[in-house]
Amino acid sequence: MFPQSAKERLAQSDLCAMDSLSQIVLGAAVGETVLGRRIGNRAMIWGAVAGTIPDMDVLGRYFLSELDNLAFHRGISHSLFFSVVGAFVFGWAADLLYRSRHHALIAMVTKAAAAVVVGFVVNFLTMILVPGKWLPIAVYISLVGLWWWRHGQRRYFGGTWEAPDAGRREWAALFFWGFLTHILLDCFTTYGTQIFAPFSNMRIAWGTISVADPMYTVPFLVCLLVAARFARTDRRRALWNWAGIGLSSAYLLLTVVHFNRVSHTFKEALITQDIAYERFFITPTIFNNILWNGVVDAGDAYLLAQHSFYDEVPVTFTPVPKGLDLLRNVDTDPTLATLRWFSDGFLNAVRRNDGQLQVNDMRFGTFSGEATGPDDYIFRFNLTDNGPDAPYGFQQAQGGPPDDTAETMMRSLVKRAQGIKASATE
């Protein structure tokens, strides 16, 4: 196994549910829309909780095998079925909690849970922006403690706290829309979302937006924070909240336009270069919607390519062998069947320097945009050969490209997104 680092978290943020920040913001805005006028900022807090609950399926790693957990993530908890049933269950639970005579204590626990969620967001941003630094999270913990010392004790134990004016139906509506919008946003990413579970394991992956895109999240977050400063009956509160929803939704629609533009560019390049192919898959690179990765299924091999909207040169394709001849029982092995399903068939195999087999989900591409070696693949898995009659053992590989740093990766990403100029190829 390889040491986990900031660059792995950067590359595999989808698997680790690092998109929670966007889902928290979206959930909070939805909660405000449903109940904000009646219960104020508590609607945002509970909306953020609703936006986080589906991703709690990551806890499956503690009681499932790695292979089963891979299939479980974005499964039943991300389904339309869960949105309906879960809304009634959590709505009933929230109503029951606030009807309890211990509602003040419950409110305190809820606030603590919200602080933990926000702390997770701070920790996420710290890992991305200043990996290895502990000061931001320490400052956050200090501010939470200061707030509790000055306001929390008096409010929750001084008799000034009141239960929110919401019934079971209103709570169920908040959770339903929080769950549903979470699922829909995930459908726009690459990983795949089983929205029809448990009736079907079909995965929806439109691949129009990166799992972490600040252009979607940051304006949304700013509008939400401004809205939270106004009283619940102030019209400006709703205005700012809807501004955030409108901006984020408009950007999401723009990513669909970008997707169609890049898809057309790839088709034209394949036709112009007289390349026969069966299908291709495109997806934006991390943190932006300008630089896109593409993988083409050309039959016996894959073709990798990157395209930036600022490129002045044609798309260049790099062939990568499928390597399926390295595997045995390709059509019957249950481990390989799960990986083919997970990757939508965009799977290749390589042999590592230590002799171990490695299979890669080609939809996520490589760090370099080509395929310089086994460690260059972003989404990769190690296989253990247990004998000719036994299924392959499975273990998700960890680590990033050797001798690299998150800062170097980001610089390379920014430079490539700026495009390849025609003069550079002359």
Regions found by a protein language model. Give the residues of each.
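N-terminal membrane-targeting hydrophobic helices
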Residues: 2-264, 268-284
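Extracytosolic and intramembrane catalytic regions of membrane-associated proteins
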Residues: 276-279, 286-426
